[in-house]
A protein has these predicted regions:
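A feature for loop-to-transmembrane-helix boundaries and adjacent hydrophobic helices
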Residues: 1-329
């Protein structure tokens, strides 16, 4: 039967020469996604008049808090995987530790919460408008998530119900997420691949909507929440998820996806009502960044005016000089 093979455990870690530790493929892929998102977000912000490199100042706050939020959410929804008799909670190097984030186990909804707090702090620090940054980040974040799903592939996680489709995913028999009683060789829905495709399509949709309707004031990020939440709600409904919390028979991640859609709709309609026009500046009032190149151009213009006035025998800055200046003609 045709299927998608999963990489073996040797692919999960990359050995380094002259170093006792190994790089986790999951962590490396997440890092690539962060770098790609940072570069694209920086480019989008710079085009709006923001200071080049300001995204790095904000990410210094957002990335660590996003990682903490992602891990905290995962541990909170899978407590039996981490809290059991004999577990050493304070050893970060013990396999299965709550601190071993390089082994996988991070929830995007927790990352969004932690990252949003970090962005708020970073925007207060730099003077950038929160919604300006969120809008610039939205498609880049979705692209980073698409890249990050490859990490789930190498860790053999984020797969769905059994299937006989030709693109069914092979999962090692020892995977603890596989339900008891399934025969060896069972294939599963490759949810990581479905989400990658959904996210990439979403990148194009978000960019097109922003250009077509000139969306600002957080409405681009609202579209991101609606798009991602809608797709994730379906994928979670067919996912084999060992999370332990449900409400009305619905897993916690499905509720979180519904919440993302509702929050996106609220942001979109509230911001459309409050801010029907365009943003006056990417910065908050009184915190605007002045481009040094613009100051140089302004100084050059002043010097040209002074030279023209001297050539006419009129003191620079006088009323006569202003009257004879070509810029006032």
């Amino acid at each position: 039967m045709a299927s998608i093979p999963s990489p073996g455990p040797e692919w999960a870690q990359i050995p380094l020469p002259f170093w006792p530790y190994r790089i986790q493929m999951y962590a490396l892929i997440i890092l690539v996604g962060i770098v790609v998102a940072a570069m694209w977000t920086s480019r989008r912000l710079t085009k709006q008049g923001a200071e080049p490199g300001v995204v790095l100042d904000i990410l210094l706050c957002a990335v660590p808090l996003g990682i903490v939020g992602a891990r905290f959410y995962h541990v909170a929804t899978h407590p039996k995987d981490f809290f059991y008799p004999g577990a050493n909670l304070f050893n970060p190097f013990e396999p299965g530790s709550i601190w071993a984030i390089w082994e996988g186990g991070g929830a995007i909804f927790g990352a969004l919460i932690g990252g949003a707090i970090g962005v708020l702090i970073g925007c207060r620090w730099t003077g950038l408008r929160f919604w300006t940054f969120a809008d610039a980040l939205a498609p880049a974040l979705l692209l980073a998530q698409a890249i990050g799903r490859l990490g789930n592939y190498f860790n053999q996680e984020l797969f769905g119900l059994p299937t006989d489709l030709p693109w069914g995913l092979q999962i090692d028999a020892g995977n603890k997420a596989i339900p008891v009683g399934l025969p060896d060789g069972t294939l599963f829905q490759p949810l990581f691949l479905y989400e990658m495709i959904w996210n990439i399509i979403g990148v194009f949709v978000i960019v097109w909507l922003q250009r077509r309707f000139r969306l600002q004031w957080g409405k681009v990020f609202a579209v991101y929440l609606i798009w991602y939440g809608a797709g994730r709600s379906y994928l979670e409904s067919i996912r084999i998820d060992p999370s332990e919390f449900t409400f009305l028979g619905i897993p916690s991640n499905v509720w979180a996806a519904f919440g993302a859609v509702v929050l996106g709709l609220i942001i979109f309609f509230v911001q459309s009502s409050r801010h029907p026009g365009l943003e006056p500046s990417p910065y908050r009032p009184g915190r605007e960044w002045v481009n040094p190149d613009a100051e140089v151009d302004s100084d050059d213009t002043d010097l040209e005016d002074e030279d023209a006035a001297d050539a006419d025998g009129v003191p620079a800055g006088s009323a006569s000089a202003k009257a004879t200046s070509p810029t006032n003609g």
